[in-house]
Amino acid sequence: EAEVVVLGAGVAGLTLARLLWERGRKVLVVAEALGEASRPPVALVNPLRGRRFTLAEEGERALAAALAFYGRFVPLHLGVFRPVPEEDRPKVAGRLSRLKHRWEKEGVLLEEAFWLEPRPLLARLAEGLPLLRGRVLAWEPPWLVLEGGGRVRGEVLVYAGGGRGAHLLGLEGRHVPGLVLTLLDYFPRAVSYRVYLAGAALGGSYLPGEEGYRLPPPTEGEVEWLLQGAEALVGYRPRVA
């Protein structure tokens, strides 16, 4: 038992658990393993999203909080370059007034957006936290039922298990699968438009969103779409590892 049981040990779940634990709360994290969907080689933290350049809700505040928190645990690679078509520049400029940025010939550099490596971040966030490794089979309020017959409950249950376990609590949502390729080339400054390049990773979301969770295998069309997007950004096709 604990005051707060966090179901899921990805970046979201471990961040919440660590913040509560640092404030003296009795916390227990329940997960099969560290990470799940939070284990790609690179994670991009960028408040200006998509081809429509939508500023995330409370994007400025969230970015400042992410810089301050994640920077305690792992190196942050500052700067995300967003190519911006000429016709979109007035619209984008109006959304950047409170973000530190610099216009360049082809677009805008978000100077405090960044990328990081999630795997060392997960390990550092988990240090010292009470972590129960196990597969959750069901939610029978107030109990989480684990494989093997174990049961866990908390005064508060926080779900942070992503799309894979959402059915346990009857949660619904739109799931958008993505693909990340590991590269032989290295991009110290992230660049993002349709796809993103950062460090030794190329990623993006090619498939349409779905109501139910599934993990589709990569397709030749998806890989080709990523490589075409990368070529449009940097003028050549990066080498895939």
Describe every region a protein language model picked out.
Residues A2, E147-V156:
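Core beta-strand elements of the Rossmann-like FAD/NAD(P) dinucleotide-binding domain
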Residues A2-L28:
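N-terminal Rossmann-like FAD-binding beta1-loop-alpha1 element of flavoenzymes
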Residues E22-P41:
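Glycine-rich FAD pyrophosphate-binding loop
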Residues V42-G107:
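Dinucleotide-binding Rossmann-like beta1-alpha1 core, especially the glycine-rich loop
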Residues G154-V191, T219-E222, L233-P238:
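Central helical "cap/lid" subdomain
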